[in-house]
Amino acid sequence: GSIIWAETVRAVRRMNPNTTMETLIPDFQGVERNLNRILEAAPEIISHNMETVRRLTREVRIQAKYDRSLGVLKYLKENGANRTKSGIMLGIGERREEILETMDDLREVGCEVMTIGQYLRPSAANIPVLEYVTPETFDSYRAIGLDKGFS
């Protein structure tokens, strides 16, 4: 897994050294040697999505763990990542205070960029959309995120 990500970054650099690179990686189960491969490839942004709030992680991300994802982002930042990025989806039953807690958790591990988007159900086999979040609510979270130091 991580070898392919790192080789892809290096291949793009060889073809176009001026390309800004962002990688969106899985947690690699928190295995440091896999994370180090990504760090050694040196993309400008390393992204690993939390996907949801702590309470819903087990339901939404069957193989992932909330704290392991935070640990991955922290490890990346502490070991030389230029910028780290993460994102969550809304509309699956999360509460405002849980979203704010996730923002705080991400800032605590040094994450600089956060995206928040609307969850859209890919198929009937996936969890249903419980709410379509309004643009005004997204604007509110954007303002809060900027106040918390996200770019």
Residue map of PLM features:
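Generic structural signal for helix capping and beta-alpha/helix-loop junctions
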Residues: 31, 55, 123-124
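A structural motif
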Residues: 40-43, 47, 51
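Glycine-rich phosphate-binding active-site loops on the catalytic face of alpha/beta enzymes
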Residues: 50, 54, 116-119
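Auxiliary Fe-S-binding modules of radical SAM enzymes
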Residues: 10-18, 40-41, 64-151
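Canonical radical SAM enzyme core domain
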Residues: 2-38, 52, 90-98
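Active-site-adjacent beta->alpha loops and helix N-cap segments on the catalytic face
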Residues: 2-8, 55-71
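Hydrophobic residues within beta-strands of alpha/beta enzymes
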Residues: 1, 46-48, 114
